[in-house]
């Protein structure tokens, strides 16, 4: 899981800390040593025993240090200079992430050119940051093995090659790689295929209390760090009749944080070197409240109190409110416009006043995102008719589909508690429009630009180009250096690299057009655009295919549409296709706001 990014994108974890410590020219790396003693494995930093009390996320480093933590983790290393300086100024170390590509984002570990480029990027990261005094470990990859068996030897070779290079460049900081849990070939991959990896980083949620036992049973001997742990994962909780999971309350989650830390971290002396709790900040994943230890407005939840006590030995003087699971009066499956009542029980440990906010949102329906960015579903305005500390009354929307009612309970000190309950409006569900293929970046979009065709070695694709987007913060830049007579194409696929051998796709029934904005660098570039690519000869075809050919772009942004009426849009696995013809000296085009609409 974690804060993932696409292969071409970088993760910037910004700090809210305002006090920076410019790295002096005379600053030196603090040596970190991994030592095996009679009692087991031990980490030494600056010659002194060092147990990692850390967190991952983009929340305040000042609050993290004040809570008793001593370390922070990043998933990538782009533009982390300020974060390293801020961490060092606060006495925090940093496990610096070296992002490795994911196959589901289009990275191909059998492509030697991609692997070489990735290794060189890792080299530059190490050379840039190895002497910074905040650096603790190198985190080489995060769940790059994927969510299957995790036993692809080509991936493990790439990991080990990078780790071996890192050790030569920087003998002062140990190497770690991070896997999604321990199943399949993950233990053997790290233990047997990666001799240059010193530490096994483990992302585990429901399995955190038993991780030490399972790790030993799998034959592992290297030390481990819990690199992500938190509440039960969305995949670990049963779903209701329409496929929605019941999210634990913030109070129940806090209790599970404690259990995981006491069993999987401090309960495994000599094997566990510490941990990084997830997520120190706010994160939309499955729901807006599932994984974050803070709300979007900065309010601290009960998990912060628990970790403060576990790190520092003392709980905060003011604790977050507690909340019991919400209770629906009547049915949870309702007709459009029905009224429903929900009961709540909230307690403030100090006996103070509580104020509440009730919010109804459409359910995201995306529960297995692997940490990829997703936008927060909008609030359904006017749905909550009455909201109190002991319950709420609401009127369900007219649009059929799944929804979720959220309770946010605050005390006067900026602490909060959350609970929610899924609800369903009966009737035929239609995909909300507009439905974006691209909006301000590749990350978090339904389809991945993974289907490269033609002279792909001559193409560069940038989904975060900030120069003159049509709207928002970024647009797509395609730069092709092929000669006249050559061509290149990119298909947006779901899931990534789906050439018809996988299930997937989206039901876009009701969409009338695919709409996009495009321009050319010189106003002479020619493109073809389309929806759908996979024919009936494939095991899992697109339900429709259509193209618009020989579009000559202009230098200014122009809107283009593909008519979709009367097409079967029930299963679109290839959301968008663009091909670009070569020209002298090169061809550069820009695309923005690619979306399905209903007119």
Describe the predicted segments one by one.
Residues 35-38, 44-197, 210, 220, ...:
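Active-site mouth of glycoside hydrolases
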Residues 37, 45-54, 65, 216-373, ...:
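Substrate-binding clefts and catalytic carboxylate motifs of secreted carbohydrate-active enzymes
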Residues 181-213, 234-241, 281-288:
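Substrate-binding cleft/loops of secretory-pathway carbohydrate-active enzymes
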Residues 341, 402-406, 513, 573-575:
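Short, conserved beta-strand segments of beta-strand-rich sandwich/propeller modules, principally
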Residues 395-401, 565-570:
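Short, surface-exposed loop/turn segments at beta-strand-coil junctions that are enriched for proline
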Residues 419-426:
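C-terminal edge beta-strand
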Residues 428-599:
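Beta-rich carbohydrate-recognition modules and glycan-binding surfaces
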């Amino acid at each position: 899981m974690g804060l993932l990014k696409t292969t071409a994108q970088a993760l910037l974890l910004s700090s809210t800390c305002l006090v920076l410590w410019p790295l002096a020219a005379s600053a030196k790396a603090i040596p970190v040593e991994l030592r095996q003693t009679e009692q087991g494995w031990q980490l030494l930093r600056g010659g002194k025993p060092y147990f990692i009390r850390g967190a991952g996320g983009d929340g305040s480093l000042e609050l993290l240090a004040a809570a008793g933590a001593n370390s922070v983790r990043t998933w990538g290393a782009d533009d982390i200079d300020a974060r390293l300086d801020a961490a060092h100024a606060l006495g925090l170390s940093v496990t610096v992430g070296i992002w490795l590509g994911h196959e589901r984002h289009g990275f191909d570990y059998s492509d030697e050119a991609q692997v070489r480029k990735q290794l060189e990027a890792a080299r530059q990261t190490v050379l840039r940051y190895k002497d910074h005094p905040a650096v603790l470990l190198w985190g080489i990859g995060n769940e790059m093995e994927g969510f299957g068996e995790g036993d692809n030897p080509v991936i493990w070779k790439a990991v080990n090659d990078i780790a071996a290079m890192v050790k030569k460049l920087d003998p002062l900081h140990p190497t770690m790689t991070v896997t999604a849990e321990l199943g399949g070939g993950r233990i053997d991959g790290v233990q047997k295929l990666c001799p240059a990896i010193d530490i096994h980083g483990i992302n585990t949620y429901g399995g955190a209390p038993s991780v030490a036992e399972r790790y030993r049973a799998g034959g592992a001997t290297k030390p481990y760090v819990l690199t992500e742990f938190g509440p039960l994962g969305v995949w670990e909780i049963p779903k209701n009749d329409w496929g929605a999971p019941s999210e634990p309350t913030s109070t129940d989650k806090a209790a599970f944080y404690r259990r995981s830390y006491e069993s999987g971290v401090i309960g495994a002396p000599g094997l566990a070197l510490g941990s990084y709790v997830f997520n120190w900040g706010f994160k939309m994943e499955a729901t807006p409240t599932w994984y974050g230890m803070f709300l979007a407005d900065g309010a601290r939840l009960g998990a912060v109190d628990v970790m403060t006590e576990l790190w520092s030995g003392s709980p905060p003087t003011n604790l977050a409110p507690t909340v019991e699971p919400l209770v629906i009066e009547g049915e949870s499956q309702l007709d459009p416009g029905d009224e429903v009542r929900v009961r709540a029980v909230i307690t403030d440990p100090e006996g103070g006043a509580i104020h509440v906010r009730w919010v109804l949102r459409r359910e995201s329906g995306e529960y297995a995102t692997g940490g990829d960015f997703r936008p927060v579903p909008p609030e359904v305005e006017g749905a909550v008719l009455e909201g109190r500390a002991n319950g709420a009354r609401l009127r369900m929307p007219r649009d059929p589909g799944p929804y979720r009612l959220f309770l946010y309970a605050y005390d006067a000190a900026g602490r909060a508690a959350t609970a929610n309950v899924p609800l369903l409006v009966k009737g035929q569900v239609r995909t909300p429009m507009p439905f974006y293929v691209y909006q301000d970046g590749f990350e978090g979009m339904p389809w991945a630009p993974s289907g490269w065709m033609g002279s792909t070695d001559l193409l560069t694709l940038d989904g975060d180009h900030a120069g003159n987007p049509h709207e928002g913060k970024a647009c797509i830049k395609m730069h092709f250096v092929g000669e006249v007579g050559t061509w290149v194409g990119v298909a947006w696929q779901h899931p990534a690299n789906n050439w018809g051998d996988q299930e997937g796709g989206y039901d876009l029934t009701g969409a009338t057009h695919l709409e996009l904005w495009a321009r050319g660098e010189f106003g002479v570039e020619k493109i073809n655009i389309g929806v759908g690519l996979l024919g009936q000869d494939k095991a899992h075809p697109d339900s429709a295919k259509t193209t618009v050919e020989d579009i000559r772009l202009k230098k200014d942004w122009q809107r283009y549409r593909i008519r979709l009426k009367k097409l079967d849009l029930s299963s679109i696995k290839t959301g968008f296709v663009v091909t670009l013809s070569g020209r002298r000296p090169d061809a550069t085009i820009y695309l923005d706001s690619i979306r399905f609409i209903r007119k």
